[in-house]
Amino acid sequence: MPMAQESMKFSLIRLNNFMRDRTLKGLEGTDLKASFTPVLAALGDTDGLTVSELSHITGLDKSNITRNIQQLSELGYIVKDSRNSPIILTRKGKDAADLIMKIQREAYDELISCLDDDERRMFIGVAAKVFRSIEGKGF
């Protein structure tokens, strides 16, 4: 693999690790696990989603979503009435989603603090293009 691709690969791994570590640190003292964060963050932006919708939005497979939903329900973060009904956050779940978004926003702000306004716009544009490409391939 050419050096530029290796460098990009390791940079992406480090970015992922940075976000994961900041999230874990922010969740200390709660009963939340890092695996809950994509589900809670996705639900925090909606009035409810189905398992299929959560799977599409988060990129997690349905069995992973189902496990997280079961645990989040047992902990009182979500309500799910029936198999095909939307999953809805409880007040506790909304508070958790707000906390997760705050943690991730602070981590993101720290990540891009070294960029000027033009570089930030470019970074966001390139990232959006990459993610659109990935989505088009079924990820």
Question: Where would I find each of the regions flagged by the language model?
Answer:
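Short amphipathic alpha-helical interaction elements located at domain edges
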Residues: 121, 131-139
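N-terminal helix-turn-helix DNA-binding core of bacterial DNA-binding proteins
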Residues: 22-64, 71
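N-terminal leader segment of winged-helix/HTH proteins
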Residues: 1-30, 77, 86
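Short amphipathic alpha-helical elements of helix-turn-helix/winged-helix folds
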Residues: 18, 42-46, 126, 133
